[in-house]
Amino acid sequence: MNRSVRKGRIAAVSATAAMLGLVGACGTDEAGGEGGGGQQGGGKNIADPVTVTYDGGMYVLDGNTLEVQADVELDGFNRLNPAGDDRHVVVSTSEGFQLFDAVAGEMTDVAFPGAEPGHVVRHAGRTVLFTDGTGEVRSFDPHDLGDGMPETEEYTTEHPHHGVAVELENGGVVVTLGDEEERNGIAVLDENREEVTRNEDCPEVHGESAAQGEAIAVGCEDGVLIYKDGEITKVDSPTEYGRIGNQSGSPESPIILGDYKQDEDAELERPTEVALVDTEKKKLERVKLPASYTFRSLARGPEGEALVLGTDGKIHVIDETSGELTDSIDVIGEWSEPMEWQEPRPAIFVRGSTAYVSDPGEKQLHAVDLESGEVTGTADLDQAPNELSGTLHEH
């Protein structure tokens, strides 16, 4: 077991102060390569950073040694997403979106204020932020983050809602439709943000993912909408109620991995099936798992294989083409999903051939080699981990 080493606490870095620009910006030299190095700012140079929130702050770990290199104070419930480069992570706070320099282990002064920051999507070399409380859609090139506030394109939906947007390779945008009362579909906009087409047959639209060939999928409570080659297609769920609200795609595969919930009346459904959606054949296949899972359980491997972290503590590996369960990797002990979605539960984050798995019950983070199926490292943390994310490798 590799025991983590505390490297000191960064004092008084609050989300509110950062939003007001009181936290110093990083420098201008952008990191390059898989090491996530560079001399952009601060005294640290954390390799392949992995970030983990806890109640009151965020840890930054060296992705190779799993040593805790930074401990940042951060009030409230905060969410994490890769920013799209090998240096930054997007932190969703009560004030809006904020850019965190994970290599330096410190907040930047790059912020996108707005009530109820929602989905962060990376596609076609662009990162898109959707602010639920305002309906603002803001997109930028993540490789410009090393120079401070990036040049940003903005669009505002007709009504604020819990939505998501994806910028396409041609500069167009796929964006959800809805308001505070209901969400019912998607619209496709061109590079001038003029509507090209729409589909309103997607009740409670939620989540997105991109598959091979720029097929964009969004989930519905009765199936999936797929946008590809200028057309929107509905793939219906095989059950009367078949909600797909969280998806994971891969550029290596035309298959989308999604959760699959069938009990419309459940206070908290603990699903034991996942959906594999073929964006080429427009078909949906359900795969039965030996354990339940949560919205933080879905990931993709380096070859496009579907990965599901089960409540039995195993990473279940599914051949996304055949739907066959090919392996189950032991990582942590059995666990149970909490009733409140903000409460800590195990999560999985995959980068390259390494899967990082958090264990709030044991206050640990594990690294798993997906090729060998071996746990290669374990970090012991002082606080129970909640959100799990990290920087991305450059290609």
Regions found by a protein language model. Give the residues of each.
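Repeated scaffold domains used in trafficking and secretory/extracellular systems
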Residues: 37-43, 74-87, 111-126, 156-170, ...
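An edge-strand/N-cap motif at the start of beta-rich repeat modules
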Residues: 37-67
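C-terminal motif of bacterial Sec signal peptides marking the signal peptidase cleavage site
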Residues: 22-25
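Short beta-strand elements that form the blades of beta-propeller/WD-repeat-like
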Residues: 44-54, 81-98, 119-139, 165-180, ...
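A short beta-strand motif characteristic of beta-propeller blades
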Residues: 64-73, 103-112, 146-157, 193-200, ...
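Intrinsically disordered, low-complexity segments enriched in Gly and acidic/Ser/Thr residues
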Residues: 273-357
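Acidic, serine/threonine- and glycine-rich low-complexity intrinsically disordered segments
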Residues: 180-301
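Blade-level signature of beta-propeller repeat domains, shared across WD40, Kelch, NHL, RCC1
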Residues: 358-395
